[in-house]
């Protein structure tokens, strides 16, 4: 019996380009959706741009355009990127739409009527220059716990403490640089604790990934809190009904964007929207998301739906991040690759296949090893799969005018291939794509071994063996057809070219039906080898792209420095004695390695040589040094006798000295030539 399903991907933020990290999720979901279509299920695949929030408002102002213009350009670019990677959305919409405004307003009113919206007056930091309340991430200052400078308003990335923005020492607006003032404002809250019982039951249903269920249990033990769903003007978003100058927080209307995109599709095609969203719906609803937004999709979103008497997701499928060559994607190394840059140089099916070969049902990071990428694509797709067709098709075309044999040369081998159909289907269903690919490639090896053992090139030279030659080559093409059917969800373009060659549609239902006695088209090249020079071209273009951006930012920074040269410096600190100073053991250290801490916006991780030993130091100077690997080999000055400090991202065994006001305005101290690691500063 056919299943009815609705599938979504997390909404890309309309404030930047799509990159290969985004593509992991969209390729994963698209493979799953295409498989379900091949199985005959009624499935709809929707997404949208997440188009609201303070960052979009500020970025638009910075560019001298309206937020509407900014998000329209982003949507055009995003749609082009997804199309380039053959992501088969039935609809791609925007959260800044009439459908989303209507549904968001309706759901808010329903939650309010059901008693799940609370209000209270809160105190917030306010930028007197920009006349706007400042979100936590738009306030910076000194950490109240460890006194680290240039920390965000909600947590310290040096000591991992959390706090209120008003606890910051010397806070400043990240928008204008002004010193914020405290103002009161009425805010609206979603009463999440009221849904704890429902959420616990949903967690125990067994349908969620174990990692998500375990994480939810931690959140339950910590205690659920009411969720602030309002923001004060100015803000780019939807206004809250009956509340002057109040807007819905972007994370309230973002998941509702799933519904809005589907509603837009329903209005255009006549689909029944309520059938998929009513509380007793018998359809299935799946969300593919990254591990960084599990909190919103496993707590707030199902609670909101339940509070509005709507159905909850059947499941939420989370995935990990993409690393390149074992480390976080890097702009300076050229591995923070935008989708549009990739598409200029490399076939999108290469990445689809590589991701599929490594994706499983767990929340694990996936490493894009560039050397392995080239080797696997060429080995599996070109040398094994496509070569299987080409080495047999030439004989069928030249000797038999494209006509296949009337019977299978090896029925047992064909039956073995068909017998794997349900196991491969189960792997696809369970999102264990790596297992599906492994099994398909095992079959591909068997198919090529069959051809090697039969050696049609030898048979072709023997008198009176035409029937045997036709039978062997037809068998090879038949096995290629089965393999391409199994790979169609992963490689839709290659499958389309294979269908043109085979003169038949590849479906799951006809896998077991051989093309006996039928004609195939003249063989044309199905797939090109992936060359290292293509990878190099992507890397170099990515480096150039971000180098140009850094140059523009550096130019602005220099102008800013020139404009502030005459500003007052910080006052001299209180006097100390020579004995106080003598307590510090300052040493010269050589940078052995330096890399960004992936989870932190501030920290660089240094490995330092002090002559007789090495130290690891975490330093909050990321904003000042965009290319940390360029620091390797430099000499720095460090406080060597500072007690080791266990931080959120590891242990720091000292402090590197720098000068400046903080943020991008920091400069490492260095020394003259001739110094050696371990020398004491006196």
UniProtKB/Swiss-Prot annotation:
Residues that coordinate or bind ATP: 331
Residue ranges annotated for the tRNA-binding domain, each copy included: 580-682
Keywords associated with the record: Aminoacyl-tRNA synthetase, ATP-binding, Cytoplasm, Ligase, Metal-binding, Nucleotide-binding, Protein biosynthesis, RNA-binding, tRNA-binding, Zinc
Motif ('HIGH' region): 12-22
Entry note: cofactor: Binds 1 zinc ion per subunit.
InterPro entries: aa-tRNA-synth_I_CS, Anticodon_Met, Met-tRNA-synth_bsu_C, Met-tRNA_ligase_1, Met-tRNA_synth, Methionyl/Leucyl_tRNA_Synth, MetRS_core, MetRS_Zn
CC annotations in GO: cytosol
Catalytic reaction list: tRNA(Met) + L-methionine + ATP = L-methionyl-tRNA(Met) + AMP + diphosphate
Enzyme class: ligase
Cofactor: Zn(2+)
EC number(s) reported in the record: 6.1.1.10
GO MF, one annotated term: ATP binding
Claim: Zinc is one of the keywords in the record: yes
Residue numbers covered by motif 'KMSKS' region: 328-332
Coiled coil region boundaries: none
Keyword Transcription in record: no
Domain of life (superkingdom): Bacteria
Localization terms from the record: Cytoplasm
Binding-site residues, Zn(2+): 143, 146, 156, 159
A Pfam family this chain is assigned to: tRNA-synt_1g
UniProt subunit comment: Homodimer.
Family: Belongs to the class-I aminoacyl-tRNA synthetase family. MetG type 1 subfamily.
UniProt name for this protein: Methionine--tRNA ligase
């Amino acid at each position: 019996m056919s299943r009815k399903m609705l599938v979504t991907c997390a909404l890309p933020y309309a404030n930047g380009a799509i990159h290969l990290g985004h593509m992991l999720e969209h390729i994963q979901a698209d493979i799953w959706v295409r498989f379900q279509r091949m199985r005959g299920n009624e499935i709809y695949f929707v997404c949208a741009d997440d188009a609201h929030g303070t960052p979009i408002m500020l970025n638009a102002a910075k560019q001298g355009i309206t937020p509407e213009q900014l998000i329209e350009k982003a949507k055009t670019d995003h749609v082009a990127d997804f199309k380039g990677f053959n992501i088969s959305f039935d609809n791609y919409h925007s959260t800044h739409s009439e459908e989303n405004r209507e549904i968001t307003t309706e759901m808010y009113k329903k939650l309010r009527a059901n008693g799940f919206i609370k209000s209270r007056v809160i105190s917030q930091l306010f930028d007197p220059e920009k006349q706007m309340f400042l979100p936590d991430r738009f306030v910076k200052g000194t950490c109240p716990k460890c006194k680290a400078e240039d920390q965000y308003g909600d947590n310290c990335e040096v000591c991992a403490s959390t706090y209120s923005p008003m606890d910051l020492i010397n806070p400043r607006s990240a928008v204008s640089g002004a010193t914020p003032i405290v103002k009161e404002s009425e805010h609206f809250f979603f009463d999440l604790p009221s849904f704890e019982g429902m959420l616990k039951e949903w967690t125990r249903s067994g349908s969620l990934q174990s990692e998500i269920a375990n994480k939810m249990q931690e959140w339950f033990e910590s205690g659920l809190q009411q969720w602030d769903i309002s923001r004060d003007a100015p803000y780019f978003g939807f206004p809250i009904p009956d509340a002057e100058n109040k807007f819905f927080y972007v994370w309230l209307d973002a998941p509702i964007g799933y519904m809005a995109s589907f509603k837009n599709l329903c209005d255009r095609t006549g689909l029944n929207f309520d059938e998929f969203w009513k509380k007793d719906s018998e359809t299935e609803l799946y969300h593919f998301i990254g591990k960084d937004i599990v909190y919103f999709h496993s707590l707030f979103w199902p609670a909101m739906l339940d509070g509005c008497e709507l159905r909850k997701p059947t499941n939420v499928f989370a995935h990990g991040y993409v690393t390149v060559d074992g480390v976080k994607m890097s702009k300076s190394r050229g591995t923070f690759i935008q989708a549009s840059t990739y598409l200029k140089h490399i076939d999108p099916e290469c990445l689809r296949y590589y991701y599929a070969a490594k994706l499983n049902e767990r929340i694990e990071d996936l490493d894009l090893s560039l050397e392995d990428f080239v080797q696997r694509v060429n080995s599996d797709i070109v040398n094994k799969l496509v070569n299987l067709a080409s080495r047999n098709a030439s004989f069928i075309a030249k000797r038999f005018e494209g006509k296949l044999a009337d019977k299978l040369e090896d029925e047992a081998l064909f039956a073995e291939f068909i017998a794997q159909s349900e196991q491969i289907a189960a792997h696809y269903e369970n999102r264990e794509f790596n297992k599906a690919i492994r099994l398909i490639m095992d079959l591909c090896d068997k198919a090529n071994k069959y051809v090697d053992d039969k050696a049609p090139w030898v048979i072709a030279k023997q008198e009176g063996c035409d029937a045997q030659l036709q039978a062997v080559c037809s068998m090879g093409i038949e096995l290629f057809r089965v393999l391409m059917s199994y790979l169609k969800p992963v490689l839709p373009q290659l499958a389309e070219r294979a269908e043109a060659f085979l003169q038949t549609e590849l479906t799951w239902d006809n896998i077991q039906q051989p093309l006996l006695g039928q004609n195939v088209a003249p063989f044309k090249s199905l797939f090109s080898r992936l060359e290292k020079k293509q990878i190099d071209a992507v890397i170099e273009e990515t480096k150039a792209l971000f180098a140009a951006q850094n140059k523009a930012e550096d130019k602005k920074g220099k102008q800013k420095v020139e404009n502030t040269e005459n500003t007052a410096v910080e006052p001299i600190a209180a006097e100390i004695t020579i004995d106080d100073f003598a307590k510090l053991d300052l040493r010269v250290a050589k940078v052995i390695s330096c890399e960004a801490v992936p989870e932190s916006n501030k920290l660089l991780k240094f490995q330092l040589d002090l002559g007789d030993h090495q130290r690891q130091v975490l330093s909050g100077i990321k904003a000042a040094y965009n290319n940390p690997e360029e620091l390797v080999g430099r000499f720095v000055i460090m406080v060597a006798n500072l007690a080791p400090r266990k931080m959120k991202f590891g242990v720091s065994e000292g402090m590197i000295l720098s000068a400046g006001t903080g943020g991008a305005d920091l400069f490492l101290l260095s020394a003259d030539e001739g110094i050696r690691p371990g020398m004491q500063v006196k």
